């Protein structure tokens, strides 16, 4: 059984027991979270596709960890001007473990 849900402007395909990385959620580590923006649920040959969401289906997950991703360097360089600008960015993320699809 698997499902597709939306979180943080992105769509994720998950199954029970899977750990995924999402955009940062303001929920403490160890807490549970429910996602109700379920776009599709498949159980064998039984497939339900929402328009836009499947009614009555929720995905339950447990927050495992919070952190920051790898650093991305942004460089702006102007040739022959002796001008250079550097900037870095590290995106916050939340790791969640899917505990149930109901």
Curated annotation (Swiss-Prot):
GO terms for cellular component: cytoplasm; ribonucleoprotein complex; ribosome. The keyword Cell membrane does not apply. One of its GO terms (biological process) is translation. Keywords: Ribonucleoprotein, Ribosomal protein, RNA-binding, rRNA-binding. PROSITE patterns: RIBOSOMAL_L21 (PS01169). InterPro entries: bL21-like, bL21-like_sf, Ribosomal_bL21, Ribosomal_bL21_CS. Pfam families: Ribosomal_L21p. GO terms for molecular function: rRNA binding; structural constituent of ribosome. This protein binds to 23S rRNA in the presence of protein L20. Belongs to the bacterial ribosomal protein bL21 family. This is Large ribosomal subunit protein bL21. The gene is rplU.
